[in-house]
C-alpha cells in the first residue's frame, strides 16, 4: 500500500505574493496540481495534502478526486510537524508513506516510482532522493557512508565545512510507515529556526538510504519568481522539442509558448511571438503567426493566421485570418473564408468563402456562403439590455460602412448600399439603401465666429 503526503501549508514569503506559493502556475497548471498529477500516476491509496496558509484557496484549486484528502496544519511548525499532524489521521496505515513538497512541479512519476522500488529492494526504514548540485545554496546537505545516510543538516544550520558538501536533500522521502509512526512524535524543535524538521527522522531510523539521481532540473523547488521562470523555460523547451521532433517548425522557438494539452499537426509553421494555449488543435500545413495568440481553438488544415487572436472557436480548412483580427468565443469560420485587417467576430457562424476583409464587427450573426462584407460593416447586436441575432443569406454583398440593426434578416443575394443603416428585413435578390439624401449648398461660406 502507498500513501502520499504533499506538503503545501507554507506561505512562500520569497515569492512576494498575495497568492500561496503552490498556486502559482507553470504553463497553465498550479505547482501543486503538477505534483498531484505525477503522484496520481503511482495509483496511491490516498493522497493527503497538508494545507495551512490560505487553506481554502488551496483546496478549491485542486481537481477533485476521491482519493485526495486535506489536512490543516495550524500553526505551521515545520515539515516534521506536518507529518505529526498527518499521523493522527493515518494511525493504522500499512505500507509506504511518500512525502514530498508541493513546489517541485517538474518531478516525474517515473522518478517517484524508482524511489519506491529502491526503497522496497533495500527493506529500508526511509529512502531519500538526493542529488549533487554545482550550486547547493538553499538546500540541506546529506552526509552518507556506504549509501546509508548518517545525517542531514539544513543549510541554515550548516557550518563552513558542511556547506562545502554538494550532496543535497531533494525533500522527497519514502518511509516505512510502521517504523516512522513509532518515532514521528518524538521529534523536537532543537534548531535555530525552532521548527520540527522531518530530516531529524534520519538519525532515529536505522536503515536510511540515499537514492541519488542526476540533477536534470526535475528536482528544482520553487522559492521565488526567478526559479518559477526557470522552470517555465524548462517545461516550454521540452514541449517545443517534442513538437519539433514530431514535424512542427518553430521560426523562433524561444519567443513562443505552447500548452501541454495543445495538439499540432505535421508541417505546421509557428512564427515568432506566437502563443498557443489551452486545448487547442492545429491541423496539418498551417502557418501560425507571427504575433498570434490562440486559446482553446480548433484550426483545420491549410490555414494561415497572422498577427491575430483566436479564442474558443473553430476554423475550417484553407481559411486566412489577419493581420490584426480578433476571433472571440463561439465562432465557426468555414472553408476558404477570409478575415482581414482589424476585424472582430464574436459568437458567429460564417459559411464557406465569406470575406470580411476590413475594419468590421460581426457579432451574434450567421453569414451565408460567398457573401462579401464591405469595409466598416457593423452588426449592432446590443440595445443596452439584450443582444440580438443578425442573419445574412448567401451570395450577398454588404456595402462599406453598413450598420445592421439587429434583430434583422437579410435574404440571399441581398445588396446594401454603402453607408446605410439597415433596420428592416430584406428579401432575396433585393437592394437595401437607407441613408440621407446628399444636399449640396453652393457658395457656402463657413461661419468664422
Swiss-Prot record:
It is found in: Cytoplasm. Binds 1 Mg(2+) ion per subunit. Residues 247-449 are annotated as: N-acetyltransferase. The active site is at 358 (proton acceptor). Residues 1-225 are annotated as: Pyrophosphorylase. Its EC number is 2.7.7.23, 2.3.1.157. Pathway: Nucleotide-sugar biosynthesis; UDP-N-acetyl-alpha-D-glucosamine biosynthesis; N-acetyl-alpha-D-glucosamine 1-phosphate from alpha-D-glucosamine 6-phosphate (route II): step 2/2; Nucleotide-sugar biosynthesis; UDP-N-acetyl-alpha-D-glucosamine biosynthesis; UDP-N-acetyl-alpha-D-glucosamine from N-acetyl-alpha-D-glucosamine 1-phosphate: step 1/1; Bacterial outer membrane biogenesis; LPS lipid A biosynthesis. It is an enzyme of class 2 (transferase). Residues 226-246 are annotated as: Linker. Gene3D superfamilies: Hexapeptide repeat proteins, Spore Coat Polysaccharide Biosynthesis Protein SpsA, Chain A. Acetyl-CoA binds at residues 375, 418, 435. In the N-terminal section; belongs to the N-acetylglucosamine-1-phosphate uridyltransferase family. Homotrimer. This is Bifunctional protein GlmU. It comes from Prochlorococcus marinus subsp. pastoris (strain CCMP1986 / NIES-2087 / MED4). The gene is glmU.
Amino acid at each position: 500500500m502507498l500513501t502520499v503526503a504533499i506538503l503545501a501549508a507554507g506561505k512562500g514569503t520569497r515569492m512576494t505574493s498575495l497568492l500561496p506559493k503552490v498556486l502559482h502556475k507553470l504553463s497553465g497548471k498550479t505547482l501543486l496540481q503538477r505534483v498531484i498529477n505525477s503522484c496520481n500516476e503511482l495509483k496511491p491509496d490516498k493522497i493527503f495534502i497538508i494545507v495551512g496558509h490560505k487553506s481554502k484557496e488551496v483546496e478549491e484549486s485542486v481537481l477533485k478526486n476521491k482519493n485526495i484528502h486535506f489536512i490543516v496544519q495550524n500553526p505551521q511548525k515545520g515539515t516534521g510537524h506536518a507529518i505529526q499532524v498527518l499521523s493522527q489521521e493515518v494511525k493504522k496505515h500499512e505500507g509506504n508513506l511518500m512525502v514530498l513538497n508541493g513546489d517541485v512541479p517538474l518531478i516525474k512519476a517515473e522518478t517517484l516510482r524508482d524511489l519506491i522500488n529502491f526503497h522496497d529492494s533495500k527493506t529500508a526504514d526511509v529512502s531519500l532522493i538526493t542529488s549533487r548540485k554545482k550550486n547547493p545554496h538553499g538546500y540541506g546537505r546529506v552526509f552518507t557512508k556506504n549509501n546509508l545516510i548518517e545525517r542531514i543538516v539544513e543549510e541554515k544550520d550548516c557550518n563552513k565545512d558542511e556547506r562545502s558538501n554538494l550532496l543535497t536533500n531533494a525533500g522527497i522521502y519514502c518511509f516505512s510507515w510502521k517504523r516512522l509512526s513509532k518515532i514521528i512524535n518524538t521529534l523536537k524543535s532543537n534548531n535555530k529556526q525552532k521548527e520540527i524538521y522531518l530530516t531529524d527522522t534520519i538519525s532515529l531510523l536505522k536503515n536510511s538510504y540515499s537514492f541519488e539521481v542526476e540533477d536534470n532540473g526535475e528536482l528544482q523547488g520553487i522559492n521565488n519568481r526567478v526559479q518559477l521562470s526557470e522552470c517555465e523555460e524548462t517545461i516550454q523547451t521540452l514541449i517545443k522539442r517534442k513538437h519539433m521532433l514530431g514535424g512542427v517548425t518553430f521560426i523562433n522557438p524561444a519567443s513562443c509558448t505552447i500548452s501541454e494539452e495543445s495538439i499540432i499537426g505535421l508541417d505546421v509553421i509557428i512564427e515568432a511571438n506566437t502563443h498557443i494555449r489551452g486545448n487547442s488543435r492545429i491541423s496539418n500545413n498551417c502557418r501560425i503567426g507571427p504575433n498570434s495568440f490562440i486559446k482553446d481553438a480548433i484550426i483545420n488544415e491549410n490555414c494561415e493566421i497572422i498577427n491575430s487572436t483566436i479564442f474558443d472557436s473553430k476554423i475550417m480548412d484553407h481559411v486566412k485570418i489577419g493581420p490584426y483580427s480578433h476571433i472571440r468565443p463561439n465562432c465557426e469560420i468555414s472553408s476558404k473564408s477570409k478575415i482581414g485587417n482589424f476585424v472582430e467576430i464574436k459568437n458567429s457562424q460564417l459559411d464557406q468563402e465569406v470575406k470580411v476583409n476590413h475594419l468590421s464587427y460581426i457579432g451574434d450573426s450567421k453569414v451565408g456562403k460567398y457573401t462579401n462584407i464591405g469595409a466598416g460593416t457593423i452588426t449592432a447586436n446590443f440595445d443596452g439590455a439584450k443582444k440580438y441575432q443578425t442573419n445574412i443569406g448567401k451570395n450577398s454583398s454588404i456595402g462599406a460602412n453598413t450598420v445592421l440593426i439587429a434583430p434583422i434578416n437579410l435574404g440571399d443575394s441581398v445588396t446594401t448600399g454603402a453607408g446605410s443603416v439597415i433596420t428592416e428585413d430584406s428579401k432575396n435578390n433585393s437592394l437595401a439603401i437607407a441613408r440621407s439624401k446628399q444636399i449640396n449648398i453652393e457658395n457656402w461660406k463657413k461661419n468664422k465666429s
